[in-house]
């Protein structure tokens, strides 16, 4: 049943680590809700910045937020004005000091979350779903992906009956735990209703048993700002 489970959750502790990295005893529920609130706020505020991941760490009663984005300039703003304002807002929400790191995604065409969001925005603009899917697959394969699969479901093209369409190229070995598979979803809100987009990108195999392996790859590609 490897096809049914979330590929990220299945690989936690093998070649992928958690997006919230902290330990709490009594305050666990409070901090968890705080994390959810911070993520929701950032994803809404930075919609135009192409945010893929938000990592939250809590060393010594502080919060360290790392934003993985395709457009760091949009997050930072002119002379760093926007990022300072953002840091202040996050500090108020978290009730303490928050440090912000911005990590640039050099190849957004290989990031599953960004691919899904791009296809969803095209569906909202009434671009033909097959063309949007095919274009995304071609871009990913051209930039070095070993395999990609895209699922689009809902009232595609305004059809009366909802259905699922998928497109795949290359290998996407969901059962292989050492496979570096990136998974992302997005929702397109069209006039006919919502359409769901799921994307799996296979980037190769990670042979070392290292939960931080995927993060190290990302950091090698783009130094943090």
Curated annotation (Swiss-Prot):
Any single GO CC term annotated in Swiss-Prot or TrEMBL for this entry: cytosolic small ribosomal subunit
Record-level Gene Ontology MF annotations: mRNA binding; rRNA binding; structural constituent of ribosome
Pfam families, A to Z: KH_2, Ribosomal_S3_C
Keyword Ribosomal protein appears in the UniProt entry: yes
Residue ranges of domain KH type-2 in the record: 38-106
CDD domains, sorted: KH-II_30S_S3
Keywords: Ribonucleoprotein, Ribosomal protein, RNA-binding, rRNA-binding
Gene Ontology biological process terms, A to Z: translation
Subunit architecture: Part of the 30S ribosomal subunit. Forms a tight complex with proteins S10 and S14.
NCBIfam families in the cross-refs: rpsC_bact (TIGR01009)
Function summary: Binds the lower part of the 30S subunit head. Binds mRNA in the 70S ribosome, positioning it for translation.
Stated family: Belongs to the universal ribosomal protein uS3 family.
Protein name in UniProt: Small ribosomal subunit protein uS3
Species whose genome carries this gene: Rhodospirillum centenum (strain ATCC 51521 / SW)
Organismal lineage: Bacteria, Pseudomonadati, Pseudomonadota, Alphaproteobacteria, Rhodospirillales
């Amino acid at each position: 049943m490897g096809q049914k489970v979330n590929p990220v959750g299945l690989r936690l502790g093998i070649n992928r680590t958690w997006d919230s990295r902290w330990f709490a005893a009594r305050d666990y529920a409070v901090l968890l809700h705080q994390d959810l609130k911070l993520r929701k706020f950032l994803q809404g505020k930075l919609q135009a910045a192409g945010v893929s991941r938000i990592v939250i760490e809590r060393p010594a009663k502080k919060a360290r937020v790392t934003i993985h984005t395709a457009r760091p300039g949009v997050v930072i703003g002119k002379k760093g004005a926007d990022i300072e304002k953002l840091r202040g807002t996050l500090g108020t929400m978290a009730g303490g000091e928050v440090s912000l790191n911005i990590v640039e995604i050099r190849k957004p065409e290989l990031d599953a979350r960004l691919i899904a969001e791009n296809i969803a925005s095209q569906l909202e603009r009434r671009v033909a779903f097959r063309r949007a899917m095919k274009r995304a697959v071609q871009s990913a394969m051209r930039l070095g992906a070993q395999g990609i699969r895209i699922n689009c479901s809902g009232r595609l093209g305004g059809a009366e009956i909802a259905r699922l369409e998928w497109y795949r190229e290359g290998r996407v070995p969901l059962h292989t735990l050492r496979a570096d598979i990136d998974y992302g979803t997005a929702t397109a809100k069209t006039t006919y209703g919502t359409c769901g987009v799921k994307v799996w990108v296979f980037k190769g195999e990670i042979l070392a048993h290292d939960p931080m392996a995927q993060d190290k790859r990302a950091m090698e590609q783009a130094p943090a700002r």
